[in-house]
C-alpha cells in the first residue's frame, strides 16, 4: 500500500517569531594577518539563508503548504534580503519594521569547512509594542489551520501568552518550539516541542524512558498543555498526551551529517500536517520521517514532498515503515542475510490502546524485526461489522508504523492473512489472545518451513470494543 501524504496544498499555517538572516562567507585561508595572529580569509562565495522562524516558514512552504511569516525586522539591507529569499520560496511575509533596531543577522566566516568566527548583529526586540503582531495574528486566524510560535528569545514573542489566547479563542492549534526554562509563559499551548536537553533543563535529568513519560505528563498537567513532543536526537521522539499511551518513535535517520535546523523541520511538518486535517499522531509520524531526511543534509535544510514520500513509504532500501507486499519481501530477505530473526503478527488495530502497545512490544522482544499485518477496511467490516473500522486503514498503518516496536506494516484484503504469511514465512508467528497455536492462520505454513508459532496474552482490561462502548455511553450521558 502507498501512504498518501497530507493534502499540504490546502494547509494554511502562520509562523510568528524571531526571524533572522544567516550569512555565510566562504574562502581559502593560506596566511596569517600581519596585523594580528588571525587567519586571512579571501572571500570568494557569499550565501544568505533565512534563519530562526523564517526557516520554519521555509520548511512549511517547501511541502507545498501556504506559509505566512510574521516577525520583527529593521529597515535595512538584511530585511530586504530576507524578504526576497522568502518570496522566492513562496513564503508570504508580513514583517513589522522597527526603525530603531537592526534585522537580526548572524554572519559566519568559514574556510576549509571550518567556522572561524561568528558575528552577531542584533538588539533585543523586548519592549517593542506587540500590538501590530497581535493584529496580524487576528487577521489570519480565520484562514489558517495552525499557528506556530518560534521562540529564539529575541523579543518577538514577549507577549506569547496573549498570542496563545488569541489562537485558543479561535480554535486554532498553537505549536511552540520553546526557549529557556520558563515554560509557564507557554501555558495553554496545544503542543510544545522541546528537544531532550531543553526538556531536562526544566524537569531534571531523566535516566529512563519511564522518567521522561512521568515528568512529561506532569509538565502537561502543570501548564495545561494538550500534548508534548520531546525530540531525542538518535533516540527518535516521544509524543505524550493525557489519557493516551506514550508514542515512542525511533529515529528514521540513516546517516547524520548535520542537525542544524532539524527542530525547525519537525515543527514545520507537524504544523502543515495538522493544518491539512491529519491527526497529531500522523503529524508526528511525518515529522519524524522528515527529520530523518534533513539530518542527512549539510546545513539548514528543508524537505520536499518527494523526499518525505520516499521516507514514509519505507522503501526496501530504507528498511522501515509501511510497505507493499513486494517491498516487504525484499526487506525480509535483506534481514535474513543479516541473520535477523523475523517475527510476524496481525490484527485490526482499530483504536490503538495500551494493551496493543504492550502486546507489540512483547512480540518485538521475541526476535529482531517485527512485521504487523493489518486487515483492510473491507476485511475489518466483514470481521467486526458495518460500524468498523473507526479509523481507516491508512491511519491505522501510519500509527502502527510510528511505534518503536514495529519495523514493517503491511495490509491484506482477505478475511485472514494466511496467503500473506505463506508468502513471507516468518521465523516466528505470534498471535494475542486465547488461541490454540494450530488455530492461528498461517501456522501450518510456518511450521512446515521450520518456524515457530507463539500465543501471547493481551493486557487485561484493554479492549477496542469497550473503548467504543464507553464513548457511545458518554455521548448518551
UniProtKB/Swiss-Prot annotation:
Enzyme Commission number, as recorded: 2.7.1.167, 2.7.7.70
GO molecular function: ATP binding; heptose 7-phosphate kinase activity; heptose-1-phosphate adenylyltransferase activity; phosphotransferase activity, alcohol group as acceptor
Active site positions, chain numbering: 264
Sites bearing N6-acetyllysine, chain numbering: 179
Region (Cytidylyltransferase): 344-477
InterPro entries: Bifunc_HldE, Carboh/pur_kinase_PfkB_CS, Cyt_trans-like, PfkB_dom, RfaE_dom_I, RfaE_dom_II, Ribokinase-like, Rossmann-like_a/b/a_fold
Entry keyword set: Acetylation, ATP-binding, Carbohydrate metabolism, Kinase, Multifunctional enzyme, Nucleotide-binding, Nucleotidyltransferase, Transferase
Pfam families linked to this entry: CTP_transf_like (PF01467), PfkB (PF00294)
Chain segments carrying region Ribokinase: 1-318
Primary role: Catalyzes the ADP transfer from ATP to D-glycero-beta-D-manno-heptose 1-phosphate, yielding ADP-D-glycero-beta-D-manno-heptose.
Name of this chain's protein: Bifunctional protein HldE
